[in-house]
């Protein structure tokens, strides 16, 4: 499809971990929340600058969840939110992440609505049409200043920045009725 993605591999508990190809590397738990005994734990993305940090991240996370290890891509975070009906786009919205926690990349804590960048619109359209998507999705990207981008993930659900879309006049929940 020509959609750019960071190189990555999934590491499962008890399988050992392959050697890291480049630094920094990103360790993403497959699950953001896990139940442990009587509590719910939040798992977060770790950006590792060296083997020691990577080993610590894997030791912390692998007992709780498989992880995705990806090459780090420097850029700003963007979300392209869509509502598709039987493989056809009906509603579009986009936001830029102004601030993330941690600041080097993670959950967004401050965003602004933007016009959907052309290259991200094309990548989103190519992906979701190919998948014959039906319903909502938030397609997350990182984009460098020169317009090069990487797909980070597709969230097949309503997203944390939904209130920004609604406040901007793009009411996805109403459109889903």
Where are these regions (language model features)?
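Short secondary-structure junction motifs
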Residues: 5, 66, 134-138
């Amino acid at each position: 499809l020509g959609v750019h993605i960071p190189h990555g591999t999934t590491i499962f508990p008890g399988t050992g971990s392959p050697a890291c190809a480049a630094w920094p590397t990103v360790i993403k738990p497959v699950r953001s929340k896990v139940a442990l005994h009587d509590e719910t734990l939040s798992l977060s993305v770790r950006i590792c600058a060296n083997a020691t940090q990577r080993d610590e991240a894997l030791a912390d996370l692998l007992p709780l969840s498989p992880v995705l290890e990806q090459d780090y891509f420097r850029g700003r975070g963007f979300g392209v939110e869509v509502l598709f009906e039987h493989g056809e786009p009906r509603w579009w919205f986009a936001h830029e992440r102004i601030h993330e926690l941690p600041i080097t990349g993670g959950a967004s804590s401050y965003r602004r609505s933007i016009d959907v960048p052309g290259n991200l619109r094309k990548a989103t359209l190519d992906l979701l049409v190919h998948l014959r998507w039906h319903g909502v999705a938030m397609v997350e990207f990182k984009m460098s200043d020169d317009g090069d981008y990487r797909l980070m993930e597709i969230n097949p659900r309503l997203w944390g920045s939904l209130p920004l879309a609604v406040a901007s006049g793009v009411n996805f929940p109403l459109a889903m009725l």
